[in-house]
C-alpha cells in the first residue's frame, strides 16, 4: 500500500510503501462498529445512580386504611407509583458497562480503520513535525499552511514542544502509536503519521 508523503506546505510529494496487512485491508463496518462501541463502553465511569423504594427517605406509615375510603389501596408513600417514590429498576454505580473484544479482533478493527482512512485520503505521512519552541502560534501557523483544521498526529515519540504547543488548539491531538484508539481515528478529519510511527504501527498490528 502506498501512502502519500506531505511536505511542510501540505503538498503531496513522494510516496511511502506500507504493509498491506495494516493499510491495505478490506473495510469491515461491523467489526469497526463493535470495536468503537466497546472502546466507548469501557471508557464509561458508571457513576449514575437513583434510589429504589428502600433507599428513599419516607415514612413507612400506611397513608390511609385499607378499606372504606373509596381510594386505591396504598401501603407507603415510597411506592414507585407515587410522586417522590423510589425507582422500580434504578441505575446503580455497580453496573458493569465493559465490553470484551479479543486482541485479534481489536487489531483487525484498527487495521480496517487505517486502511479506509488511506483509501479516503484522510491519512498522510510526514517526515517529522518539529517545533523550535513550545508556542501554540507556531503550530497553528504550520497547520494553516498545510490546510489542516482537525488533525490527529501519530508520532513515534511525543516531543515536549509539540505537546505543549498543541494543548490549547481545538480538534488537535497527539499520540504515540500504542495509544491510537479507534474513536479518535474516526473522529478527526485528517490523520498525520510520521515515518517512524508507520513502522511502529506495522509492528504493533501485523
Swiss-Prot record:
GO biological process: translation
Record keywords, A-Z: Ribonucleoprotein, Ribosomal protein, RNA-binding, rRNA-binding
Biased composition regions of type Basic residues, renumbered to the chain: 58-70
Region (Disordered): 45-78
GO cellular component, one term: ribonucleoprotein complex
InterPro entries assigned to the protein according to its UniProt record, in alphabetical order: Ribosomal_uL4 (IPR002136), Ribosomal_uL4-like (IPR013005), Ribosomal_uL4_dom_sf (IPR023574)
Keyword RNA-binding in record: yes
Record has Ion transport as a keyword: no
A molecular-function term among this protein's GO annotations: structural constituent of ribosome
Gene3D superfamilies with a match to the protein in the record: 3.40.1370.10
Similarity comment: family membership: Belongs to the universal ribosomal protein uL4 family.
HAMAP family recorded: Ribosomal_uL4_B
PANTHER family: 50S RIBOSOMAL PROTEIN L4, LARGE RIBOSOMAL SUBUNIT PROTEIN UL4M
Quaternary assembly: Part of the 50S ribosomal subunit.
Function according to Swiss-Prot or TrEMBL: One of the primary rRNA binding proteins, this protein initially binds near the 5'-end of the 23S rRNA. It is important during the early stages of 50S assembly. It makes multiple contacts with different domains of the 23S rRNA in the assembled 50S subunit and ribosome. Forms part of the polypeptide exit tunnel.
Protein name per UniProt: Large ribosomal subunit protein uL4
UniProt organism field: Burkholderia cenocepacia (strain HI2424)
Gene name of the record: rplD
Amino acid at each position: 500500500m502506498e501512502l502519500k508523503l506531505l511536505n511542510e506546505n501540505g503538498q503531496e510529494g513522494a510516496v511511502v510503501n506500507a504493509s498491506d496487512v495494516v493499510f491495505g485491508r478490506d473495510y469491515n463496518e461491523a467489526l469497526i462498529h463493535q470495536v468503537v462501541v466497546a472502546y466507548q463502553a469501557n471508557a464509561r465511569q458508571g457513576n449514575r445512580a437513583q434510589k429504589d423504594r428502600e433507599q428513599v427517605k419516607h415514612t413507612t406509615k400506611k397513608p390511609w386504611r385499607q378499606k372504606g375510603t373509596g381510594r386505591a389501596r396504598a401501603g407507603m408513600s415510597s411506592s414507585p407509583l407515587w410522586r417522590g417514590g423510589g425507582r422500580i429498576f434504578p441505575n446503580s454505580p455497580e453496573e458493569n458497562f465493559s465490553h470484551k473484544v479479543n486482541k485479534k479482533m481489536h487489531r483487525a478493527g484498527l487495521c480496517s480503520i487505517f486502511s479506509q482512512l488511506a483509501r479516503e485520503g484522510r491519512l498522510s505521512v510526514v517526515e517529522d513535525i518539529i517545533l523550535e519552541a513550545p508556542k501554540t502560534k507556531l503550530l497553528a501557523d504550520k497547520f494553516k499552511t498545510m490546510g489542516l483544521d482537525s488533525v490527529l498526529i501519530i508520532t513515534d515519540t511525543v516531543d515536549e514542544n509539540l505537546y505543549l504547543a498543541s494543548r490549547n488548539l481545538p480538534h488537535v491531538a497527539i499520540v504515540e502509536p500504542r495509544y491510537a484508539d479507534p474513536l479518535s481515528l474516526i473522529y478527526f478529519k485528517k490523520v498525520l503519521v510520521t515515518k517512524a510511527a508507520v513502522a511502529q504501527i506495522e509492528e504493533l498490528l501485523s
